[in-house]
């Protein structure tokens, strides 16, 4: 299996990003994944428009209607925002996904099980109109999907219809909207449709359910991976694409698909690389290829809506599957030595493997929340909040345990083996191996 990681950007590129410059340095001499130049001209124009959007309330596809404006402006409750599908996939992500999965791939229909505001189906329509020269009702009838929120479904139908009319001016927008109402269903994800479709299926955003812990959609993805799809794309929270609890899904993807592209994209602070942010992963997988397993991924790139092009042009370096440990890589070349030492070290022991007796233990208070603010101390905190946890540690390793917090050893372990969130006390206790 060939595994490639596109590592963190060089200093001059980071300066370009930090200064907000629009020019993109020439990285081809370093070896890059650059797909933009192969796009049809019309797709390039859409992409260029998409990456320049700095205000998510604006749309390259036309005017946002009053419903969308109310979703962005009025709700302050997180539950309400999620229920109204506040978090949408950026247009450039949708365009990349559609362009790659629809390349030389004949299908009956394209099905998006979580439509959002329609960005994927809009990008799909554009690519099909260019590559397969589809237009008018032949193009309209290709686009299918489902959505769990009525308001969001209404937005998607209006946005998709507006795009289709731009592609095929002979279409009448009212008639297109009525047809899309039949093809884009209001659906409860707990009752995911069993109907087999011979086209593309994409998880654009995880469906949200009040009170859930963020993984109610994992069985849906499991079902898609086991299906007879020739191609698919998963657009996931990066923590899920890299976390231990979803390793079984990654193993299935590796087993069932031969060529896999993963792009770690967008902005959300997470302690995976120092000073580098990310929000979502895009995993694109293709079956039935003669070529051996191939896995290509970006590093976690820092950018803003004005320079998303950086995500699609990045230096590359190779890692082996064993070094990635079957996890979509979060390991930079600089961390490989630590990675290998931690895996093979004979002088490390897990806390859960040690016998703890009351007379030979020390009380340690640790705080693992707050992004990079990892604290460990013997003294009981003056104010005990939910952020502080109490652990009993054997005497002879207590000082080493505290030192791991201070010297960055524990943080580096979490960057590689964690899932992008605050450190779980259970994971820490069960998995971290303290130096003897």
Predicted regions mapped to residue ranges:
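Signature of N6-adenine DNA methyltransferases within the class I
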Residues: 83, 88-93, 115-122, 148-157, ...
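Residues that flank catalytic or metal-binding motifs in active/ligand-binding sites
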Residues: 180, 279-281, 387, 428
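Class I S-adenosyl-L-methionine
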Residues: 2-159, 193, 206, 217, ...
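Short, conserved SAM-binding/catalytic segment
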Residues: 157-170, 174-179
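Catalytic micro-motifs at enzyme active sites that drive phosphoryl/nucleotidyl and oxygen chemistry
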Residues: 99, 132-133, 172, 267-273, ...
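Polybasic, glycine- and aromatic-enriched phosphate-binding surface used to engage nucleic acids
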Residues: 303, 307-436
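Short hydrophobic beta-strand segments
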Residues: 108-112, 260, 361-368
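A general structural motif
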Residues: 107, 138-141, 197-199, 229, ...
């Amino acid at each position: 299996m060939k595994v490639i990681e596109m590592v963190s950007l060089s200093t001059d590129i980071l300066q370009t990003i930090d200064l907000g410059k629009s020019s993109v340095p020439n990285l081809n001499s370093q070896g890059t994944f650059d797909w933009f130049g192969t796009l049809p001209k019309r797709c390039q124009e859409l992409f260029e428009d998409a990456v320049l959007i700095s205000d998510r309330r604006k749309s390259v596809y036309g005017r946002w209607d009053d419903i969308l404006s109310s979703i962005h402006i009025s709700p302050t409750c997180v539950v309400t925002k999620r229920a109204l599908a506040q978090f949408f996939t950026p247009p450039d992500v949708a365009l990349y996904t559609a362009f790659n999965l629809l390349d030389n791939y004949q299908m009956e229909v394209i099905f998006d099980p979580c439509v959002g505001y329609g960005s994927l189906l809009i990008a799909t329509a554009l690519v099909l109109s260019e590559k397969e020269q589809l237009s008018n009702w032949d193009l309209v009838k290709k686009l299918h999907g489902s959505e769990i929120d009525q308001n969001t479904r209404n937005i998607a139908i209006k946005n998709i219809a507006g795009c289709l009319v731009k592609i095929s001016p002979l279409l009448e927008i009212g008639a297109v909207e009525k047809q899309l109402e039949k093809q884009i269903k209001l659906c409860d994800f707990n009752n995911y449709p069993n109907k087999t479709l011979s086209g593309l299926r994409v998880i654009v955003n995880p469906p949200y359910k009040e009170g859930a812990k963020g993984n109610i959609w994992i069985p849906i993805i499991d079902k898609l991976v086991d299906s007879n799809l020739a191609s698919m794309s998963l657009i996931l929270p990066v923590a899920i694409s890299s976390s231990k609890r979803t390793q079984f899904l990654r193993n299935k993807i590796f087993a069932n698909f031969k060529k896999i592209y993963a792009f770690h994209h967008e902005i959300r602070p997470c302690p995976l690389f120092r000073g580098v942010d990310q929000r979502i992963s895009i995993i694109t997988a293709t079956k039935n290829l003669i070529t051996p397993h191939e896995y290509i991924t970006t590093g976690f790139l820092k950018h803003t809506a004005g320079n998303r092009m950086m995500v699609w042009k990045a230096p590359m370096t190779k890692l082996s599957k064993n070094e990635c440990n079957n996890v979509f890589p979060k390991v930079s070349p600089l961390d490989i030595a630590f990675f290998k030492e931690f895996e093979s070290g004979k002088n490390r022991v897990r806390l859960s493997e040690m016998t703890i007796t009351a007379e030979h233990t020390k009380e340690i208070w640790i705080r693992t929340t707050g992004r990079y603010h990892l604290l460990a101390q013997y003294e009981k905190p003056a104010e005990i909040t939910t952020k502080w946890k109490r652990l009993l540690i054997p005497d002879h390793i207590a000082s080493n345990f505290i030192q791991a917090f201070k010297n960055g050893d524990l943080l580096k372990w979490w960057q590689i083996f964690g899932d992008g969130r605050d450190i779980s006390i259970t994971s820490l206790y069960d998995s971290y191996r303290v130096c003897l």
